[in-house]
Every structure is written in C-alpha cells, then in structure tokens.
Amino acid sequence: MAPIAGKKAKRGILERLNAGEVVIGDGGFVFALEKRGYVKAGPWTPEAAVEHPEAVRQLHREFLRAGSNVMQTFTFYASEDKLENRGNYVAEKISGQKVNEAACDIARQVADEGDALVAGGVSQTPSYLSCKSETEVKKIFHQQLEVFMKKNVDFLIAEYFEHVEEAVWAVEALKTSGKPIAATMCIGPEGDLHGVSPGECAVRLVKAGAAIVGVNCHFDPSTSLQTIKLMKEGLEAARLKAYLMSHALAYHTPDCGKQGFIDLPEFPFGLEPRVATRWDIQKYAREAYNLGVRYIGGCCGFEPYHIRAIAEELAPERGFLPPASEKHGSWGSGLDMHTKPWIRARARKEYWQNLRIASGRPYNPSMSKPDAWGVTKGAAELMQQKEATTEQQLRALFEKQKFKSAQ
C-alpha cells in the first residue's frame, strides 16, 4: 500500500531488525481490559474491540506513548470457535469477522499516530484441543488471515501456543500471506505440553516459515529468558537463523510448573502481590538484550509503565526516550521534588536497585503449590463445546479439585 501523502513510508519489522534496532512490543490487553471492566475473565475474548473501541484505542495509545513500536491487533482468542465456546455466544451477536476488522482498524489508527507497525495476531484454538484435524484448524487461522490481508497489517504473529504442532499449523497458514511472521509459544524450559523441547520448538517454527521466534505469557521474565536461551541454542545447533522475541508475564512465578501461571491457585484474580516492579522490568530488558533478544515486550500483567521501563532501560541503544518518560525521572530522580525529606532521599538508582520489597501480607506464604492437573490435548476435560458448561460438569471438576488438594 502506498504511503499516505506527505508521510514517509514506515520500515517493516524485518528492516528494523536487520538494521540491529530494538523493537518494543506492547503489553497485556486481556488482563488490563478485564481490570478496567471491558473483558470477561474466563473466555478472555476480545469483543471489546466492537463493544468498547474507545477503551481498546486508549490502551493502544498508552502503550505507544510508553515506547511500543508495534501495535498488535486485539485479536487474541478472536477465532470463531473461541468466540462461541462454552456458552460465550459472542459470535451469535458479533461475528468473528467484525471483531477482527474492528481490532485491525483501531490498531492501525493508533499506529499511524507514531512510528509503529501493526501486527495481526492469531492464537491457539479450542478446535485443536478438541482434536480437530489439521485442515479444520488451519481453516480457522485462514478466516482471521483474510481480515488481516484485507486490512493490510504489516506483519503477522502466531502467539500463545502450548503445542508446537498447532503453532506450526498456524505459521504454515499465515505463510500463504507472504508477510513476515513471528511465532511465540507459552512454554517454559520443559518445553511444550507434548514434551517437545524449546530448542526443537524453535527449529520447527523456523522451518515452517517464522522469521522471529520466542515465547509469550505463562512465565515470568526470568523463566522466559531461560526458555529463549534454549531456543537460541537449538537454532544454533540446527544452523538456522531467526530473530528472538520475548513477551513475558509481569508477574513473578518461580513456583509454577510446566503449565505456567495458569496452574497457580492465584490465577487469575489473586495475582496482584506477584506484579513485577518497573525496576524488575528494566532488569528483564537488559538481560533480554544481552541474550540477543531484539523484539522485547510483555504479556499478561504488563501495563504501559512496564513498557516504558523497557524503553528507558534500552534508551542508550535506541538513542531516544519515549514520550511517557517526560513525566518519569530516571530511577526515581523526580522524587527530589517531593515535600518529605525521606522520600527525597530515595531519588537514586542505588536505593531502588537494592530495596527488598515487602508484600505487606505477614500471614501469607511467599510461594504456592501449582494445581498440576497435567491434562493436555485429548483429555476429556479439555474437549471443548459450544454449549455452556453444565452444573454436572462443574461438580465433577470441584470434586477433582478437592481430591488434588488433598494429595
């Protein structure tokens, strides 16, 4: 598509990465918008793009102002089968096409307010969990891809996949577009839920057509970077090249198992004590950069101030600060304007780097025991349905939870 008159054409994602630039992604839309009252926890579907476009637009703008130069379409779980899963019935009121189109329009509008690109995103499907065929699952990805092509997104992202098999199917479907593809999996160092190692996952994704690979969601920054290191080693051993991408959680989850934070008993409504500080995220950004990751952002829990922390930490490499830094002194330097002297004494990097942060919850444990049900594709509990979950189905799950807790 020709550039708008008077505006310089934007460089694409691979042009930026080829030039050695750091690309900063956005943060966690479904969690942020759930807290604001626009997304329903449980289905986590993005119909807010149609129902409350101003809320989605504002969050995009806040991420742009914080330093993001990719506006990812709010199309997480926007496949037709997810929009009508377990009694959600969104697709009966608002078609998947309308949700995807609205999300693309909003992302493009905000991206064009700055030097940001638009990425059209697909994610794992209920159909795959229910053992549908490769052809059926790819058809779902192609439905979203048709919208992304019509709206001329700049590149594509296949994100949030627990099984590399489905991620490969997504990449293969998206590859027909001819646009650059990034692929991220929600896995930890143990690999995907079928036991495929991170290194092998990366190799399969690159061979399928992904130019950028990495992880998103499910694990904290530290664990996510451990996984990316294994992916990097796998690619090097196979003599394959790809750019690395990390969209970690903004929660500390050292106690989670193979399923990540969704296995923690606090998920999703009790995670606030685990939120990473802006200083934690600066450390994450530096460690990611040192590992060779050049596409850095966040997923669930990541708010605009977390993205600003990435942009500030990597400002020396990028050569500029984001607009949101105008109201943020580096390492708390703005506290020198505070009325209280003991707060002014905190206006220094050493204070915040060395502070051991208390939770304020003296009777609570610092770690939790993951549920670890161990179910994956093919398990009866993971077979999806259009109808709402029945009371009988819920009672069976409650009983299983009691049994697991007693073990």
From Swiss-Prot:
SUPFAM superfamilies xref list: Homocysteine S-methyltransferase (SSF82282)
Biological process annotations from GO: amino-acid betaine catabolic process; amino-acid betaine metabolic process; L-methionine salvage; methylation; response to alcohol
Protein's UniProt name: Betaine--homocysteine S-methyltransferase 1
Cofactor details (free text): Binds 1 zinc ion per subunit.
GO cellular component: cytosol; extracellular exosome; extracellular space; nucleus; protein-containing complex
Residues the record lists as N6-succinyllysine modifications: 40, 93, 98, 232, 241, 340, 377
Effect of substituting residue 119 to G: Decreases the catalytic efficiency
Coiled-coil parts of chain: none
Reported effect, residue 26 to A/I: Decreases the catalytic efficiency. Decreases the affinity for glycine betaine
EC class (word): transferase
Function in brief: Involved in the regulation of homocysteine metabolism. Converts betaine and homocysteine to dimethylglycine and methionine, respectively. This reaction is also required for the irreversible oxidation of choline.
Domain Hcy-binding span(s) in chain numbering: 11-314
Known tissue expression: Highly expressed in liver and kidney (at protein level). Expressed at lower levels in testis, lung, cerebellum, skeletal muscle and pancreas (at protein level).
Natural source organism: Rattus norvegicus (Rat)
Cofactors required: Zn(2+)
Record note on what altering residue 77 to A does: Decreases the catalytic efficiency
Pathway of action: Amine and polyamine degradation; betaine degradation; sarcosine from betaine: step 1/2; Amino-acid biosynthesis; L-methionine biosynthesis via de novo pathway; L-methionine from L-homocysteine (BhmT route): step 1/1
Molecular function as annotated in GO: betaine-homocysteine S-methyltransferase activity; identical protein binding; methyltransferase activity; protein-containing complex binding; zinc ion binding
Effect of residue 186 to A/S: Decreases the catalytic efficiency. Increases the affinity for L-homocysteine
Gene3D superfamilies: Homocysteine-binding-like domain
Record annotation: effect of changing residue 10 to A: Has no effect on tetramer assembly. Decreases the catalytic efficiency. Alters nucleocytoplasmic distribution
EC number per UniProt: 2.1.1.5
Catalytic reaction list: L-homocysteine + glycine betaine = N,N-dimethylglycine + L-methionine
Compartments (UniProt record): Cytoplasm, Cytosol; Nucleus
Modification Phosphoserine, positions: 330
Variant or mutagenesis effect after changing residue 184 to G: Decreases the catalytic efficiency
Subunit note: Homotetramer.
